[in-house]
Regions:
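C-terminal cap/substrate-recognition subdomain and adjoining C-terminal extension
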Residues: 2, 92-103, 110-253
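Alpha-helical substrate-recognition element adjacent to the catalytic core
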Residues: 2-123, 133-138
Length: 253
């Protein structure tokens, strides 16, 4: 496992890290999939969850079996999704990412239908809605059944993931860019093995501490934004460049 010093060195030599972010419980303040299951699924979903938690099955099989236990109309599902709060600091963090032109991707075992609806309600559109920067499981509603598919589950995936975050990270960074990962759950544990800088909370933070994975604890995206500004020299370099341009403009005027 790479040390914090090695990670910091890799970040320091690059002006364009790639940022990868989980969705459920990270961008949102609670796990939307768990809420759907808790409110709309047969109680036996918890037994399937336990199989996944102890490592007997991967997240793809887990979600496939669990969502088959859900019975709900589109209206019921949408009503639940629309009540999910997101991190109040996420929009500001995303503006920083956009201004600095940092590649940003959402990687989730959760479902595209849910993610797009939550982000749209929060006024977040553009590239996170169009599919090029969103990698998630697929969901569609037919009657009172929820049908799933897994377009980003690598074949073969040694861990049986619904979305193979590690493989996507390797492919998108192409070995040329340092990788930042932001997450909160056990489904993120394989992604942190690829990342150069990790921001973790809840179960992922516990996992990182138990496994000796260097990480930065956080509760909100305000903390992630502050830490990134301190870690990444591009922030200071960019600011100096802007100040220099502004100064030249004042002299000319």
């Amino acid at each position: 496992m790479r040390t914090r010093a090695n990670r910091a060195n890799k970040i320091a030599v690059s002006l364009k890290p790639v940022i990868f972010c989980d969705f459920d419980g990270t961008i949102t303040q609670l796990d939307v999939t768990d809420e759907i299951l808790a409110q709309l699924a047969h109680p036996s979903w918890r037994e399937v969850e336990q199989e996944w938690a102890c490592g007997s099955i991967g997240s793809r099989e887990c979600l496939e079996r669990q969502m088959a236990l859900v019975e709900a109309s589109a209206a019921e599902l949408n009503g639940l999704i629309d009540a999910v709060p997101i991190d109040p600091h996420f929009s500001r963090f995303l503006r920083l990412v956009d201004v600095r032109r940092l590649p940003f991707y959402v990687l989730s075992d959760g479902f595209d239908y849910v993610i797009r609806r939550v982000l749209k309600r929060a006024g977040i559109n553009g590239y996170l809605q169009n599919g090029t920067h969103l990698f998630a499981s697929a969901l569609r509603v037919e009657g009172r059944r929820l049908l799933t598919s897994f377009p980003h589950s690598a074949s073969p995936c040694a861990h049986g993931c619904a979305t193979c975050k590690a493989e996507i990270m390797r492919r998108l960074s192409a070995g040329r860019h340092p990788m930042v990962f932001i997450g909160d759950g056990l489904s993120d544990r394989f992604a942190v093995q690829e990342a150069d800088v990790v921001f973790a909370k809840r179960q992922l933070l516990t996992y990182c501490r138990e496994k000796g994975v260097t990480c930065y604890p956080f509760e909100t995206f305000a903390e992630v934004e502050t830490a990134l500004k301190e870690l990444l020299p591009f922030e200071r370099l960019q600011k100096k460049g802007e100040d220099s341009i502004n100064q030249r403009s004042r002299v000319k005027s």
